Amino acid sequence: MEKQLLDVLVELNGVWLSRSGLLHGIRNFEITTKHIHIETDCGARFTVRNSRSSRSARSLRHNKYRKPCKRCRPADEQIDRFVKKTFKEKRQTVSVFSSPKKHVPKKPKVAVIKSFSISTPSPKEASVSNSIPTPSISVVKDEVKVPEVKYTPSQIERLKTLMSPDDKIPIQDELPEFKVLEKELIQRRRDDLKKMYEEDREDRLGKLERDITEFFVDRGFLEIKSPIMIPFEYIERMGIDKDDHLNKQIFRVDESMCLRPMLAPCLYNYLRKLDKVLPDPIRIFEIGPCYRKESDGSSHLEEFTMVNFCQMGSGCTRENMEALIDEFLEHLGIEYEIEADNCMVYGDTIDIMHGDLELSSAVVGPIPLDREWGVNKPWMGAGFGLERLLKVRHNYTNIRRASRSELYYNGINTNL
């Protein structure tokens, strides 16, 4: 049965589930060409892509929520409707007469390795055996019971780094020995690298930078290249004091200089200076590396590449900001949702989400911070992490595959 679009799910449920798990009553919603604009009973506004496969659509198909919104106070009937899904229509049963089908012998089913996970014995099991518990690989398979083959943690990590998002390893009776599987994956990655060398020869991160540059230059934006080392004073002027968590993530060069953790400070300076020269509106953008002492994870890097684009003067509205973001992500072929949020530096922001991954935070000014930089006109701007865009486009499980790295080239492990 075909999945319903988000607007149908909103109408059927009669409630909205925010990213934080709050259940809201719906005051009104409107549908445009690609988006649905929702206003809740508490006055919150959400703009999301009208998609069947978005995070919002998936959440409305289920019946779990964290708690009702205290300001909306949805009625018990609304909550009951969402939880029990009483609106679902029963499927009709249709009898069809047809000629008997010819018997075709079934082919033996083949299991496919799709993912790895480490499992260890329970304390009770561990007490029975004196041997050291060995991690094992769990196999996602299609109705075939396969004996579990045990690999060491280092072997599992090695296989993970060698596998690509599209890898499927067919097996008949049991998992192959580690050396056999490793050899097969190494040969695949060597073939992938040879194919890239013969057909493309472009680094994906560099290619994305060039593609984004062309996109914004064609739309009248001036490209900026600002210093990577900036005065630490810029950080303080962004409202980040010594008690803020971002302050602890900054790479300091000496007492007065640091590696930039963001592009915004220098873009603020450019807006102020160019306002004396360029016609209204002023449009600028920059692509470049930033540095933060980020925690380890599948979505964070200490060295990452940002694109920030902003416009100052006339036409700086939320509608124009969302339209530009929509055009940009459609150009890159990336689906997204828009959600309202709040951050320490800019206050109210427009978050651009792909599933649970934040791609960007956009802001429509003026905001109180502008006074610190001598900017006194309306503006709008957004920033995207290029490695996150690549992670989404190529379905990488770990963002390091998209980063500046010696370990990976275009997502392929180079230790072959």
Curated annotation (Swiss-Prot):
Top-level taxon in the UniProt lineage: Archaea
E.C. numbers: 6.1.1.26
Bilayer-crossing regions: none
Main location: cytoplasm
Location relative to the cell: Cytoplasm
Keyword Ribosomal protein set for record: no
GO biological process: tRNA aminoacylation for protein translation
Catalytic activity: tRNA(Pyl) + L-pyrrolysine + ATP = L-pyrrolysyl-tRNA(Pyl) + AMP + diphosphate
Keyword Transmembrane: no
Cellular component aspect of the GO annotation: cytoplasm
Keyword terms, alphabetized: Aminoacyl-tRNA synthetase, ATP-binding, Cytoplasm, Ligase, Nucleotide-binding, Protein biosynthesis
One GO MF term: tRNA binding
Biological role: Catalyzes the attachment of pyrrolysine to tRNA(Pyl). Pyrrolysine is a lysine derivative encoded by the termination codon UAG.
Family: Belongs to the class-II aminoacyl-tRNA synthetase family.
Name by which UniProt lists this protein: Pyrrolysine--tRNA ligase
Lineage: Archaea, Methanobacteriati, Methanobacteriota, Stenosarchaea group, Methanomicrobia
Gene: pylS
